[in-house]
Amino acid sequence: MLFRSAEFLVKIDSMLERIRTERGSGSDFLDLKTGRGGIIEAEFVVQASQMRESIWEPKWQHAADLLQRRRVFTDAEATKLKQSYGFLRRCESVLRRYDNKAVSALPSDPNEQRKLSIRLGYDSFEIFHRDYVDARETIHVIYQRYVISTNRGAPSALQPFNLSEA
């Protein structure tokens, strides 16, 4: 079956890379949707896992729950994935409400980043930054484990998250 093949996962990863190239801002850190460990990566890992397991559930949260119940994701992975995805979606929602338009990246202005962290209820940008990086890393590690490692047949080495763009 195509959905169970390594070729399928290579196509998923290639599609994600194409989206990053075409829609990304050029700053992986700021790209909360298309960047490494971003919203789209979380959606792709769940959708690819759904296809492999023949789970046809359109709602991301319900699909993640079903994958957890079927033991595709461990309880810890599923919990962290859902928390991280929820965190990024909250960031997106707050940005969208403030800008009154679709938003796929954090603001590049440090003062606007600080304002975002306050709107999200943080006392400081540093604490928000830590949680943001943790959420992105969590999603990326899970994506690596279920899409990248699987399509190459061996565990892949993780590269450290580049914070120099922050």
Label the model's feature ranges.
Residues M1-A166:
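A nucleotide- and high-energy phosphate-metabolite-utilizing enzyme signature
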